[in-house]
Amino acid sequence: MLEYSIIQTRGFANVTEGGRVTGFQLLVRMPNYRGAWGSLIDGADVTVDGVPFSRDVTRWSLRGRTFSLDELRRSTDVHWDLAELATLTVPLDGGLRAGVHDVAVTIYLRSPYIPAFVLPLRFEARRECTLVSSGGQAGFRYGVSLYSFTGDMNTLMTLEDAMADIADLGATGIEILTQSTVLGYPEPTPAWIDEWQRLLETYRLAPTNICSWVDNQMWTDRDLTAAEAAAQLASDVRLAHRLGFGFIRPKFGVVSPELDPHPTWEETVLRTLDLAASLNVVICPEIHSPTPIKHPVTQNYIEFIERTGTEHFKLMIDTGIFQTAVVNDGHPGFDEDEVPPFLQPLKVPMSDLAEALPYVGFIQAKFFEIDETLTDLHIPWDGILRTLRDGGYAGWLSSEYEGRREPYRGREQVRRQHALLRSLASDL
């Protein structure tokens, strides 16, 4: 789906030719109510951070062909469809810095049925766009959880849109949620699985973690037995394997405000471990606020790992546990001016992360708000990345935006996080 804004979130990037950065590009949609022949396109003025770039130097790419403005004006077989994106490429030696930019575009179109004195028609747009650097790996693997796009998925975005966004960041991993993403869960159709595989191949993405639930309290009159809970988990482990995932996060039902899992969690996992090992799927319970690392819940998981010696049960760290400042991210059911105790920042120290790191299999890079200067207002990323690097972690950092749910906001925030993480990682 195209975004409502003429300027699209996706596609804002530097352009490299012959080993050097020669400019930048952005994607724009047709702003008129109908398409137009290329000869009727009268150019586009682009302004970035107050610096203007004339329409005379901007090159247009449509349907795999690239044109100067003069070439468009003389063209006879080029058409810009209403549902088609055009790429505007602006020459600029060295390109733009990574980060957030104020981008404005004015597109000029002629229309033969409108009197000449009115022409060209002007279509103006302005928005903040984030450019993500292609470097800054530092040994980490970057991905995105589709939870980041909650509210936009299936309303403003398709699964393919989400995958295209992830690939556009230069990220290579996708994390999904069983009951949010998988059509026909728990038994998706062969057609859905075929489409899933096609999209993975198209956008060159690797399945990372699949989030599932063990709904221990499914009914009001009784809880699941350990056997029933294990059957749920086993079903999701098989699904994870079918879809290509190496990690699965089971969210067990909880029995306390500190998120103590249902007492049957251990037997549930024990019943499923052999299956997980045979399919090479790692079960990762999530360490999520308000549960810190130095807590009986986390320590019980670690003791289980040590006792069993298994390689198929590890911790998933949600970086929200390192939150240092209060955030009102719009949790439903809570007064905006009152933050309940379980939403208060935990401020888990980096020393705790370093100590737990040998037991960690996956990092959910939770965040709430990154401003236009690429400052995260709540999560201390520099300390987190340094601790992970120093501890030898070379796994996934999977973006999980959990801020306010406004249209398209998650998409822009994820871009900001990747720009921030790459910048910090390049300095490690």
Predicted regions and their residues:
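Acidic/histidine-rich catalytic cores of soluble enzymes
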Residues: 174, 210, 273-382
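N-terminal pre-domain/capping segments
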Residues: 132-245, 277, 310, 314, ...
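Terminal leader/tail segments of proteins
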Residues: 1-133
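Active-site-proximal loop/turn and secondary-structure-junction residues that shape catalytic pockets
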Residues: 148-150, 178-180, 213-216, 252-256, ...
